[in-house]
Amino acid sequence: MARVKRAVNAHKKRRVVLERASGYRGQRSRLYRKAKEQLLHSFNYNFRDRKARKGDFRKLWIQRINAAVRAEGITYNRFIQGLRLAGIELDRRALAEIAVSDPDTFKTIVDAAKAALPEDVNAPVEA
């Protein structure tokens, strides 16, 4: 049987790793072992942060909605309660977009939520 020489495959593997690590700082972009270790960490960070991004956007939407409803004289949690009681089923992403891009429509939604709320804050809620 013929001997298998692996130089081409080994060089290709190293070249691919170094190309993927090209934007890293210092030895992590120039030395194969350091680049490979950094890539493994980067993949883990990427996986973790793809999951965290969903929560980050939800927090951002809630902050935007909270700022917009406070300008209308109501708190965020009372607004969400009013939406539920009024039967308005808009998610936070849509509400935040409406609050930023179309304040008049958002004011209409806030008024509908306020109207659905009971006058007494401590009154039992019938859902």
Curated annotation (Swiss-Prot):
| Record has rRNA-binding as a keyword | yes
Taken from the UniProt entry, a GO cellular component term is: ribosome
Q: Does the keyword Transmembrane apply?
A: no
Q: Name one Pfam family in it.
A: Ribosomal_L20
Q: Which GO terms describe its biological process?
A: ribosomal large subunit assembly; translation
For this UniProt record, give its keywords in alphabetical order, as a comma-separated list. Answer: Ribonucleoprotein, Ribosomal protein, RNA-binding, rRNA-binding
Q: Write down the InterPro entries for this protein, in alphabetical order.
A: Ribosomal_bL20, RIBOSOMAL_L20_CS, Ribosomal_protein_bL20_C
Instruction: Spell out the CDD domains in the cross-references.
Output: Ribosomal_L20
User: Which is an annotated GO molecular function term of this record?
Assistant: structural constituent of ribosome
Q: Which Gene3D superfamilies does the UniProt record give?
A: 6.10.160.10, Ribosomal protein L20
The record, for NCBIfam families, names: rplT_bact
The function of this protein is: Binds directly to 23S ribosomal RNA and is necessary for the in vitro assembly process of the 50S ribosomal subunit. It is not involved in the protein synthesizing functions of that subunit.
Family named by the database record: Belongs to the bacterial ribosomal protein bL20 family.
Q: What protein name does the entry list?
A: Large ribosomal subunit protein bL20
Gene for this chain: rplT
